[in-house]
Amino acid sequence: MYSYPNEQGRFGDFGGKFVPETLMQPLEEIEKAFLELKDDPSFQKDYQKLLNDYSGRPTALTFADQLTKQLGGAKIYLKREDLNHTGAHKINNALGQALLAKKMGKTKLIAETGAGQHGVAAATVAAKFGLSCIVFMGEEDVARQSLNVFRMKLLGAEVVPVSSGNGTLKDATNEAIRYWVQHCQDHFYMIGSVVGPHPYPYIVREFQRMIGEEAKAQFYQLEQSLPDKVVACVGGGSNAIGMFSAFIEETVELIGVEAAGKGVDTPLHAATITKGTKGVIHGSLTYLIQDEYGQIIEPYSISAGLDYPGVGPEHAHLHQTGRVTYESVTDDEAVSALRLLTETEGILPAIESAHALAKAFEIAKELPREKSVLVCLSGRGDKDVHTLMKVLEEEVNQDVQSEKTAVR
């Protein structure tokens, strides 16, 4: 029986609560409130109603028939978290935590964001619940994700650009935690992934677990069996934990995909489990990318949502026990997979999700037709069009020109 975390917030060797004394009481208050409410029928009814009526759950399970034909191997199914309100899985957790904050009497939300999807989700639920919202976002990510920055402001949130470090997700999280330490009386810190001190990895998993539960039931209805392999991208790892949680005790192969950036043998990657070592980041013991002196090495990925130097402690545990296999995909491989899905199925995935797709395509090609691969499509790619234009505009124009020439 899989029963993690334990009472100390540990997933095997990983997790825990490595925070200053000033945060111990706020964390204990959040844990107490969550444990009281998570099985409360009234709370669950309110949460489920929001998921159904506001976010649009359950999300679809799509058989990618044209893509499957083109690759010529196993059947590929997509769990469509891109169809959620706000365009990604992040809203699942944001709605749950906002409801929790409201029940605790908090009036203001704090959030960190990388790709901007959690920031948008936090700003969205703040508007819905009549709460104020402040979002910390690295300057580099503000530049990469200007569309989401504008969306957050349009929703009434204050967006604070963070210039320290590399100006990415790690730095935004640092600043969000610092701000929370000073304002924890009336502010609720809404962490966006299965990272941070206990109870956050547990809370976020519980507010994302419907991804796997829905997908498992939907897949069984279509195939009268379980998928052979389940694939999801991993930055902090909330969409992956949400997907994997329903299959942990089943005989299904689980594969998490990290960002290899320019290659795991270069300094430019965010492959935490592939290349990292044990350490503490943002209050949790996990794997992280660090040098021999314990200094964090700045991660890199084309994807703003995957360039985090740590990983959720449950993923660290699942890696250590061997239950989940963790692999990595480069920027170029992810962008190629994004183009292939877009061109064959008319679905534009987020660059984060494209990392999972690239690995899934590689796996599917090597399997016979009767096998199946289920992929968590964690979000849509509208937010990435600006980045893709920079990377692909010349390539796409050349392809179109070639097609015109061929027609003549």
UniProtKB/Swiss-Prot annotation:
The record describes the protein's role as: The beta subunit is responsible for the synthesis of L-tryptophan from indole and L-serine.
Q: In which pathway does it act?
A: Amino-acid biosynthesis; L-tryptophan biosynthesis; L-tryptophan from chorismate: step 5/5
List the catalytic activities from the record.
(1S,2R)-1-C-(indol-3-yl)glycerol 3-phosphate + L-serine = D-glyceraldehyde 3-phosphate + L-tryptophan + H2O
GO MF assignments: tryptophan synthase activity
* A GO cellular component annotation in the UniProt record: cytoplasm
Family (UniProt): Belongs to the TrpB family.
Keywords (alphabetical) are:
Amino-acid biosynthesis, Aromatic amino acid biosynthesis, Lyase, Pyridoxal phosphate, Tryptophan biosynthesis
Species in which this protein is naturally found: Bacillus licheniformis (strain ATCC 14580 / DSM 13 / JCM 2505 / CCUG 7422 / NBRC 12200 / NCIMB 9375 / NCTC 10341 / NRRL NRS-1264 / Gibson 46)
Q: Which Gene3D superfamilies match?
A: 3.40.50.1100
The name under which this protein is listed is: Tryptophan synthase beta chain
User: Recorded E.C. number(s)?
Assistant: 4.2.1.20
PROSITE patterns in the record, alphabetically?
A: TRP_SYNTHASE_BETA
Which Pfam family, an example, fits this chain? Answer: PALP
User: Which residues get modified to N6-(pyridoxal phosphate)lysine?
Assistant: 90
Q: How does it assemble?
A: Tetramer of two alpha and two beta chains.
Q: Which cofactors is this protein said to need? A: pyridoxal 5'-phosphate
